[in-house]
């Protein structure tokens, strides 16, 4: 019996309700796994496949991958991941789950969740609203706080390898992607990486290269009890999952943008920045278009692999091409803008800022800076808490506007747009914010 035959027997076994006391079985196939949903449980086996980016071709490799999946994902979703279970062949020749016979396959056992609550399904239903986008930004920031730093992560070398592998994989699909497009994308991506290498190396030294999720698209996030829970992190290659935290975030931003959810993507980015409160994160915005482009190219080649497995399916062809086109779009030059919105409290500055932000380039839109949030950050309190009276002293106000000006300068220097929401009562405040625009176009609005 070949490996394929052996695994097909396991698939047939796990697909049969008769082996689960008649409980219906729902089967879900991906390019690298097959999941069987039964009652309140899910059994996930690795497919006996080998791609340029993963190898599950032997039973030993699939067992190791299952064990790694549990180890990695329990940090994100301990309530979902239960353990690794053997599929065994018993003395009577029958298969069993967790039996005493020889293991012929390995399964990740999980607690089943409502699959219509995954965020890709919610996106299709138009249910990713501003509140959920805010929660997403918080959830990713929380996950990254827990992610272990990796010394000598060689992030730029890894990115160079990923770019080269993306180009090779897309080139191998001439029916889907034109050679000219693939070559142009590869060249533009390499050039973009060269421009930000010193920045990324500095961030690695600062501990911002971490063992992250690695596959943070909407299909790998689910709502449980109303809160977004991240699952299905990459387990098969620590190198792929290790990188700058913004490279991890970029997958989610890219996926939202590809689905036309620009407002949600902008809210996620702004919430993430607010939660992390790292001023030097504003500098890494210079690398965000590159990160999103690489993620889009990865998605294109993964969908191409699925197309190859399933045969010609127009929706997969179109999807793969859309992601490849988006990868190129992210690298197109964009003219950043700095918009200062002034006026007294209650005049609608914040509403206007949130409305304008997703429409400004580069994607996913402008970073919104608010004087009230900046003031509360100085006092180390949450943006929903009330400030003490001393927070409104002249000295504090000077510090607030200096902080806003410095952040606006960093954002525009990184090639991104910024919107500053503040009173701007004095001419000095208005003059200084205009100077921070660098080469970006400046617009001042007073409500």
Q: Where do the model's predicted regions map?
A:
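ATP/Mg2+ or Mg2+-diphosphate-binding catalytic cores
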Residues: 301-344
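Conserved substrate/cofactor phosphate-moiety recognition/catalytic segment
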Residues: 357-416
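Hydrophobic positions on the alpha1 helix immediately C-terminal to the Walker A/P-loop
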Residues: 352, 356
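Short, contiguous acidic/charged loop-to-helix segments that flank catalytic cores in large enzymes
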Residues: 236-243, 256-259, 382-401, 422-428
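Pre-Walker A (Motif I) flank of P-loop NTPase domains
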Residues: 208, 334-339, 415-416
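Conserved ATP-binding subdomain of kinase catalytic cores across diverse folds
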Residues: 7-213, 218-298
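Conserved lysine of the Walker
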Residues: 349
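Conserved phosphate-donor/acceptor-positioning beta-strand/loop module used by diverse small-molecule
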Residues: 439-447
């Amino acid at each position: 019996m070949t490996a394929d035959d052996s695994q097909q027997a396991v698939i047939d076994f796990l697909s049969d309700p008769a082996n689960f006391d008649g409980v219906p079985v729902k089967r879900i196939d991906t390019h690298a796994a097959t999941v069987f949903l039964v009652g309140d449980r899910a059994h996930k086996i690795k497919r006996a496949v080998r791609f340029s980016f993963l190898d599950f071709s032997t039973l030993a490799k699939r067992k190791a991958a299952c064990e790694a999946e549990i180890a990695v994902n329990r940090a994100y979703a301990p309530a979902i991941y239960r353990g690794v279970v053997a599929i065994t062949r018993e003395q009577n020749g029958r298969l069993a789950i967790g039996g005493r016979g020889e293991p012929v396959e390995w399964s990740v056992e999980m607690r089943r969740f409502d699959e219509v609550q995954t965020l890709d399904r919610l996106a299709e239903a138009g249910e990713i609203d501003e509140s959920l986008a805010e929660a997403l930004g918080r959830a990713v920031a929380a996950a990254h706080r827990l992610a272990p730093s990796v010394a000598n992560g060689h992030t730029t070398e890894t990115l160079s390898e990923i770019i080269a592998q993306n180009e090779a994989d897309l080139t191998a699909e001439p029916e889907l992607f034109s050679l000219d497009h693939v070559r142009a994308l590869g060249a533009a991506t390499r050039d973009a990486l060269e421009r930000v290498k010193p920045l990324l190396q500095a961030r690695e030294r600062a501990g911002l290269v971490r063992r992250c999720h690695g596959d943070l698209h909407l299909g790998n996030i689910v709502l449980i009890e109303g809160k977004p829970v991240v699952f299905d992190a990459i387990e098969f290659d620590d190198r792929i999952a290790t990188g700058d935290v913004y490279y991890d975030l970029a997958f989610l931003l890219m996926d939202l943008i590809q689905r036309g959810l620009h407002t949600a993507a902008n809210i996620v980015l702004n919430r993430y920045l607010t939660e992390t409160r790292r001023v030097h994160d504003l500098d890494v915005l210079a690398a965000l278009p590159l990160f999103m482009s690489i993620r889009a190219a990865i998605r294109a080649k993964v969908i191409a692999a699925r197309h190859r497995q399933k045969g010609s399916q127009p929706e997969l062809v179109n999807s793969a091409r859309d992601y490849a086109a988006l990868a190129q779009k992210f690298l197109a030059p964009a003219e950043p803008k700095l918009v200062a919105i002034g006026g007294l409290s209650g005049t609608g500055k914040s509403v206007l800022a949130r409305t304008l932000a997703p429409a400004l380039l580069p994607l996913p839109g402008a970073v919104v800076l608010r004087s009230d949030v900046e003031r509360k950050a100085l006092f180390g309190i949450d943006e929903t808490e009330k400030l003490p009276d001393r927070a409104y002293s002249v000295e504090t106000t000077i510090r607030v506007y200096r902080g806003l000006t410095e952040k606006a300068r960093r954002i525009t220097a990184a090639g991104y747009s910024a919107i500053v929401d503040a009173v701007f009562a004095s001419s000095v405040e208005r003059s200084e914010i205009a100077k921070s625009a660098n080469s970006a176009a400046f617009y001042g609005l007073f409500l």
